[in-house]
Amino acid sequence: MMKFKLVSDYRPLGDQPKAIRSLVNGIKAGMREQTLLGVTGSGKTFTVANVIAEVQKPTLVISHNKTLAAQLYEEFREFFPENAVEYFVSYYDFYQPEAYIPQTDTYIDKEASINDEIDRMRHSATQSLLSRDDVIVVSSVSCIYGIGAPTDYGEFTLHLEVGSGPGREEVLEGLINMQYERNDVEFDRGQFRVRGDTVEINPIHGTPPIRIEFFGDEIDSISTVHRVTGRRIQKLDRVTIFPAKHFVIPEDRLQRAIESIEAELEERLTELRSQNKLLEAQRLEQRTRFDMEMLREMGYCQGIENYSMHLSGRKWGEKPNTLLDYFPEDFLTVIDESHVTVPQIRGMYNGDRARKDTLVEYGFRLPSARENRPLRFDEFQESVNQVIYVSATPGRYELSRSQNIVEQIIRPTGLVDPEVRIRPVKGQVDDLLSEIRRRVERGERVLVTTLTKRMAEDLTDYYSRVGVKVRYLHSEIDTLERVEIIDDLRRGEFDCLVGVNLLREGLDLPEVALVAILDADKEGFLRSETSLIQTIGRAARNVNGEVLIYAGRFTDSVMAAVETTNRRRKLQMEYNRRHGIKPRSTRRTLREEEGPLRNLKVDEIPDHELELIIKDLEAEMRDAARNLEFERAARIRDRIMSLKSN
């Protein structure tokens, strides 16, 4: 059994040792739910890593979006380089679900673009869970959506060993049943090729291709090879091949599923005709019978997931198989930013159900299509074992259910929560302008959060006209461009960033010394106690951090947020005084572009060389994206676009 081994140059400091000890004791005592209430910059991820290393349990870490999940994945990979740290998020680059709009009689077919690299990582996650114990999977809410049953996935696994069977024909049949494709020309992931008594397999999880050489009905040798040159890399005694798809179905169950679909179809057609819904009945019969024919002939059809209840042999209302079923019973779940992630998990089922109800009502799908769904919240609760909620502002749900609430208020850096000043709304724009100019003179950065997109645009325009280097961040900017804007702020290419909701990922910036919250007296989602505390935390990584709250009256949310911040600040300052700690700003490396990217002079490069450079850069960009280095990938992408335009 492999053990988790934490590798780090740091040791627990501040409140971390106490938090680690308390959480570990809670897990060992059998506590089902605990909360780590850690302020911004207190090293919550490092605390969780230490807990995992102490309790030695396979762990699922759930984040509320792909970008945050990618950041956590990178951090855990650094902490556990010798263990299996995996990434499991939706593999769609683009996804338009099937839908019907009755008001306009508009049917929208499902459209999707699958990211091959993320698909590889999903398979790597499930394979690690079925083959070893030292596994951490960082996931989005994709973990509550249906995938194939682990029993089927494991049953279709092919175990091969030198000096024994199965023979060549059995191996080929097994690969076909596992949804591998034969392709003797190309050799992509999830494909195999045959050359005489030699079979080469390119595994779905992306490890080097495997060459199997047969002598009669025995395996003579197994080795990994280079995909292009075919050169042998390493000889192996044995190897395990996992299925190319998460949905793999035995032939006998497929036939039973088709019969079950037929029975449901007849029942539903009778019901629709009795209600005089003849158009809906005709539509349903035509679509379903076509799908059934495809299943008989090909073993697959478009939208096969809508028949998942029949194909998996589940009963009506029975819980679908998800990533959680691939974990052993005694696993640990960590829900990051739980104040956002828990409501997201809770809401997935209802949103999916509403869309499916319309498709069923108008004859586009059988009623059983509703069973292709994410977990209900109660099913999710039953599926997890022990849970740690992690947040600077945990919600009522987490706090009410936790048997142990652990505060992590003291930061390892000695930084204290920023000083909060409340100022009147009248004249807020000009008052803030003078404060911004003071910070710019000191080489510091400023974040400003407004209530509306229009106000953010107008404020940016006004400050720009009076000489402030200011940019505006809005929801329509994609992830890579967002990373670039934040990097430009850190480099000092501009000094002030204005936005509506600056709580999202990637805004823990050591250079930011002032956060301004305009119109804080307007109660609502963006000015709730939780949102205000999160926004105040954006200034908590700089030793000169300060927050200005502009409010015409003291709302309950403002008072609670200020009171919480002042309480924490007092505790932190007292701790520093007792231990003689001098606070220091956090450090976060800003990745610079590589020299060759920055120094290329397009006019001096011959066309044929320019084409080669662009090809090299495109390969480098794909590598960066594959390694989840989004900042670097974005910079390379922009350089490619610049070269192409010239």
From Swiss-Prot:
Gene Ontology MF term list: ATP binding; ATP hydrolysis activity; DNA binding; excinuclease ABC activity
Write down any Gene Ontology CC term: excinuclease repair complex
Q: Where does this protein chiefly localize? A: cytoplasm
Superkingdom, taxonomy of origin: Archaea
All copies of domain UVR, residue ranges: 611-646
Tell me where in or outside the cell this protein is found. Cytoplasm
* Domain Helicase C-terminal residue range list: 428-594
- Which pairs of Cys residues are joined through disulfide bonds in the record? none
UniProt entry tagged with the keyword Flavoprotein: no
Sorted alphabetically, the keyword list is: ATP-binding, Cytoplasm, DNA damage, DNA excision, DNA repair, Excision nuclease, Nucleotide-binding, SOS response
- Record-listed ATP binding positions: 38-45
Q: Share the domain note from the entry.
A: The beta-hairpin motif is involved in DNA binding.
Describe its assembly.
Forms a heterotetramer with UvrA during the search for lesions. Interacts with UvrC in an incision complex.
Q: What is this protein called?
A: UvrABC system protein B
The root-end lineage is:
Archaea, Methanobacteriati, Methanobacteriota, Methanomada group, Methanobacteria
Q: Which gene encodes it?
A: uvrB
